């Protein structure tokens, strides 16, 4: 699979080449997955943040994402999140805390590059049947060869 775009930066870079697995695979929180998005008309790569029954809270004021009250930490996320509209322009709103109750049988996904990612904050929940597989190995560039996490 070819990574196209910056939405998973710093974890994955544009033009990285990955191997995915899909045999007997069920998406889990923290996994990096390849998704066939009908809403976007393309394949996207995102991290699973929540699964069915989870409550995901995206708090732009405190720069946090929580799942069931527990803050998700990721060392690859280096910049503060800002809220955007559909045209990727920054804007201010009174309420900068958004709560998502993930329905059973659905996934909530986000790009690691939170400020440049079209993900569940916009396209909402993902059906696990749209997940093509989990990214497990980076093949290229050769100097970044190794396990994807």
Predicted regions, residues:
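Soluble "head" domains of membrane/secretory-pathway proteins
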Residues: 10-149
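Aromatic-capped interface at the extracytoplasmic side
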Residues: 1-8
């Amino acid at each position: 699979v070819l990574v196209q775009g910056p939405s998973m930066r710093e974890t994955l870079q544009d033009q990285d080449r990955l191997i995915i697995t899909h045999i007997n695979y069920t998406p889990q929180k923290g996994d990096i997955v390849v998704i066939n998005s009908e809403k976007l008309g393309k394949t996207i790569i995102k991290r699973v943040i929540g699964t069915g029954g989870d409550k995901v809270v995206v708090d732009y004021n405190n720069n946090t994402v929580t799942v069931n009250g527990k803050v998700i930490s990721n060392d690859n996320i280096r910049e503060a999140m800002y809220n955007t509209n559909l045209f990727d322009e920054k804007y201010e709103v009174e309420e900068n805390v958004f709560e998502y109750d993930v329905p059973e049988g659905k996934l909530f996904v986000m790009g690691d590059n939170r400020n440049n990612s079209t993900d569940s904050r916009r396209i909402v929940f993902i059906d696990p049947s749209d997940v093509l597989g989990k990214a497990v190995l980076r093949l290229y560039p050769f100097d970044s060869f190794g396990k994807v996490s």
